[in-house]
Amino acid sequence: MGSQNSKPAHKKYSKLWQALHKTHVTRYGLLADPLIGTSSTVQEECDKALRKSLIRKQNGNMTEEERRLQEGDTWEEWSDDEEEVGFPVRPRVPLRQMTYKLAVDFSHFLKEKGGLDGIYYSDRRNKILNLYALNEWGIIDDWNAWSKGPGIRFPKCFGFCFKLVPVDLHEEAQTCERHCLVHPAQMGEDPDGISHGEILVWKFDPMLAIQYDPNREYFTDMHGLVKRK
């Protein structure tokens, strides 16, 4: 108390206190996750890399799909994830029934994207169409039904602007490698499960959105679409 050393010390601390008050205030934000805002494919690739490393350490003779490698096989031969195309496995939007407007919008969307017009029909492709409508658009898969053959198959869902048209393959197309083995052009599958020996192709027809005859047997007014039009 009152010693000579106390005054210099007091001045020292007061200068330090003033210097601190003159320092500019720095604002700090929240630390961001490096994966936030990036595409989901980045996270999926990280997850695949992690699972791949775990599988290799635990059991080098098993693949990611739990297939046991045979003698002479390598793990890389089964790792073909780069060639796979991503597809949602569950609906990403609320489920809903097909309506007239939704059927027309969905048809024109498929036409603009070029994903259906002129494509050979097959049961597998028809199931993929159902899955796409369910998972991406939330459309319950009770809309994709067709009139009976032979001849042109019309959609039973009013507003869907695609029909199945029989086509004849010329000789060059029949011998082309693209149409061999299990290609839909050679399988001749039919939506009603009865083989009529026809090769069907999806064909866009905008008139299906305005032409509706309730007396024609191939139309079924699903969910009262005409009333809700």
From Swiss-Prot:
Major localisation: host cell
Region (Acidic): 76-84
Cellular compartments per GO CC: host cell plasma membrane; membrane
Top-level lineage group: Viruses
Family annotation (InterPro entries): HIV-1_Nef_core_sf, HIV_Nef
Keywords: Host cell membrane, Host membrane, Host-virus interaction, Lipoprotein, Membrane, Myristate, Viral immunoevasion, Virulence
Keyword Lipoprotein annotated: yes
Subcellular location: Host cell membrane
Domain observations: The N-terminal domain is composed of the N-myristoyl glycine and of a cluster of positively charged amino acids. It is required for inner plasma membrane targeting of Nef.
Name the record gives this protein: Protein Nef
Organism per entry: Simian immunodeficiency virus agm.vervet (isolate AGM TYO-1)
